Structure formats: C-alpha cells, structure tokens
Amino acid sequence: RRSRGLGDVYKRQSVDDEDIPAVFIDFSSTNFAGPTTAINIAKELKALRESGKRVIAFSDRLSTSSYLMASQASEVWVHPVGSLSVRGLGGMRNYNKELFENLKINIHNYSQGDFKSATETSWRSNMSENDRIQREALLFPIWDEMKALMAEGRGLEAKDIQSFADDYVGFFGEAAIGNIAYAKENNIIDGTKSFPEFRQYMIENFGRDEEAKSETYKTISFKEYAKQINKDLSFSGNHIAVITAEGAIMEGEISQGVAGLSLIHI
C-alpha cells in the first residue's frame, strides 16, 4: 500500500484545484532533507508535474538534495551569483592513530569480525577496505537513483549529472565564482534570475497581489492553503498509521539527523 502523507494530500488537492495554476517551491531552506526524504519528495513533485500542473523552483543555492527535488519542477531558476552544489553522496572521517600515539594514549580495540569500522578512526590512519566496501554498497545505489531522477527531470542522461558532480570545481570557468553559467548552458537549470527579476516574472505570470503592502505576486502558503481544504480527507476504518522517523533517537526536539524523543511517543 502506498503511503499517504501530508505531501500526498496537498498534491492531490492542488492537482484538482483550478484556482491553483502553479505550485512554487523555494528550495533555499531544504538542506535538512536527507536522501530518503529528498527522493520521496522528488517523486511527488514529478507526479505533480506530469499531472499537468506547472511547478516552479527558485533558489539562491541548491545542494545535492535540494537540486534533486528542484529538478522535478517544470522550470528551475537560480540566482545569478548563487551556487549549485551537486556533488553526490559521501563523507570524510578523521583518523587519529598518529594523534593518539603522539599524545602517548593507548587505544585498545575489542571487536571481532570483518566489518567493524565504528572504532577505526581511533586506531587506523586510513579507511579499511571493508569499510570502503560497505559504504559503497550503501551509497552507490542511492546515488544512482538520485542521478536517474535528476536526469529524467531535466531531460538529460545520468552520465551528465555524474560529470557535473565529478568536475564541480572545473565547471566554474575562468574568473567565475560559481558553475551557474555551465548549468544554464547545459540544461541543468532553466536560467538565472535575481530576486527582483524573479518577483517581476511571477507578477507577469500570475498577477500582482493588490492586498500586499509591498510589490509581490499572488500566492498562498501551503499552511494557509491547508486551512481551505474542505474535502473529507480522513482515512476512516481499521487502518494502522505508521509514523516514520529518520535519524538517531535522542532526547530533545527533532532536528537534522535526529529523531527527537519529545515528539516521538513509543
């Protein structure tokens, strides 16, 4: 059974709503999204776009996760001096063997088995082959799915996304401070607009909000839109609701990579 979340409700409602000609998403604050969340949102945006609804993405900066989601929009705009940081998945670990040796600290590792990399940073000076194998086994399939979604959304091939990620710095160009020009020329984005230019673009397409104190376009936030949804969207009957939590379960509020206990009741 397909999951039913708030995003699914908004998508189904906006598709059928003739008063909503387009959906605009600002991805400037979406670095919180991990791969799983980003992939799920990207698929929902893809379905929304394929339904015929115009989806507009704009941001002054796009990371790997936020570009994955933005790539599913009908059009993707970035600030002329913004950034497009599509660099794939990965990470770095600090290996402190020499540090502990210089500090005369003895590390005793009590572990058994081949794939026991949790303590390697304390007694190795580099990544073990087994650790590399398990990390590649985890990350490569996820990155392949992300590349495929990005490429499909922009009418490109996965190898084009891989090339862009591999040569992130090389695509800056002479005297450039970012790779936006390359992205524009190669259909990774549709183009660039400053904040005033984008505001004017939206006004021309959707009209000016006469009730706003400053010049802006007609829009309604998803929170305000939710208040106007009057359809019966309840799922009655004998259903089991599953609330998913991503990250380490720790005390406190929910944050990036942390499933806060204060909002999770088991």
Predicted regions and their residues:
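Membrane-embedded segments
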Residues: 11-75
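C-terminal long alpha-helix characteristic of the crotonase
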Residues: 152-153, 171, 190-239
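Second-shell loop/turn segments in exported
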Residues: 26-35, 54-60, 82-87, 120-137, ...
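Charged, glycine-interspersed solvent-exposed loop segments at helix/strand-loop junctions
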Residues: 93, 97-203
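Flexible, acidic/glycine-enriched loop-and-adjacent beta/alpha segments
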Residues: 56-116, 193-215
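Intrinsic disorder and flexible/low-complexity segments
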Residues: 228-263
